Swiss-Prot record:
One of its GO terms (biological process) is actin cytoskeleton organization. InterPro entries: Rib_uL2_dom2 (IPR014722), Ribosomal_eS4 (IPR000876), Ribosomal_eS4_C (IPR032277), Ribosomal_eS4_central_region (IPR013845), Ribosomal_eS4_central_sf (IPR038237), Ribosomal_eS4_KOW (IPR041982), Ribosomal_eS4_N (IPR013843), Ribosomal_eS4_N_CS (IPR018199). The gene is rps4. This is Small ribosomal subunit protein eS4. Keywords: Cytoplasm, Ribonucleoprotein, Ribosomal protein, RNA-binding, rRNA-binding.
């Protein structure tokens, strides 16, 4: 009979967006408890060892973190298995680098390099709006924050801009048609586009229709939509491709063009 929480994670059971190869061992790092779920996070050890190549082993990652040089959302983190998630800002003082954790158009975590000015804030989606004891209003966000006395105009599914140093709300983006969004779950994970229509289904899942800059249309659940900008102006810098998912044929033609080979078309 199992007693207590699980402490291990096999490599084959790890999320695909971690991009771990199957032949480098049997085990994968199991994320610690934190603001993001196991299958929606990227442990710090994978950030420093697998993505940035600043270390070769977990022991080296621990030595780096114990120098208290790595911050996530402005707080020093020394746990190699700390779960960093979507929109988190990772700062490394020694190298003066700042990264924001985003999804690429293929649905994989990517480290987007950002400027020091952009590293001062993060975006979070409002998941609940409540009124507590003595009539104090507060909101819950998808990264585990509870913020009191928000703007009365903020409602569920809106996105708030949080100042990392103070933890206060500096602006918010309402969930409206024509606003820019990124898909954070489902088959369209990582795609970016403008909200064109919202289908309401009482008692079931609301469906949101989105159109990207290439004119491709797709639909997803309301819970998978994260607003990142007003109209065509985004609040955060996006990875290469601007969230447009290309087809297999387009990717093949782009690869042939880079190599200088002839592109053959099938009639």
């Amino acid at each position: 009979m199992a007693r207590g929480p699980k402490k291990h994670l096999k490599r084959l059971a790890a999320p695909n967006h971690w991009m771990l190869d199957k032949l480098s061992g049997k085990w994968a790092p199991r994320p610690s408890s934190g603001p993001h779920k196991l299958r929606e996070c990227l442990p710090l050890i994978l950030v420093l060892r697998n993505r940035l190549k600043y270390a070769l082993t977990k022991k080296e990652v621990t030595l780096i973190l114990m120098q208290r040089l790595v911050k996530v959302d402005g707080k020093v983190r020394t746990d190699p298995n700390y779960p960093a998630g979507f929109m988190d800002v990772i700062s490394i003082e020694k190298t003066k680098e700042n990264f924001r954790l985003l999804f690429d158009p293929k649905g994989r975590f990517t480290l987007q390099r950002i400027t020091p000015e952009e590293a001062k804030f993060k975006l979070a989606r409002v998941t609940r709006v409540e009124t507590g004891n003595q009539g104090i209003p507060y909101v819950h966000t998808d990264d585990g924050r509870t913020i009191r006395y928000p703007d009365p105009a903020i409602s569920i599914h809106d996105t708030i801009k949080i100042d990392i140093e103070s933890g206060k709300i500096t602006a918010f983006i309402p969930f409206e048609v024509n606003n820019l969004c990124m898909i954070v779950g489902g088959h369209n994970l990582g795609r970016v586009g403008a909200v064109t229509h919202r289908e309401k289904h009482p008692g079931s899942f609301d469906i949101v229709h989105v159109t990207d800059t290439a004119g491709h249309q797709f639909a997803t659940r309301l819970s998978n939509v994260f607003i990142i900008g007003k109209a065509s102006q985004t609040f955060v810098s996006l990875p290469a491709g601007k969230g447009v998912r290309r087809s297999r044929v387009d990717e093949r033609n782009a690869a042939l063009k880079r190599r200088g080979e002839k592109i053959e078309t099938v009639a």
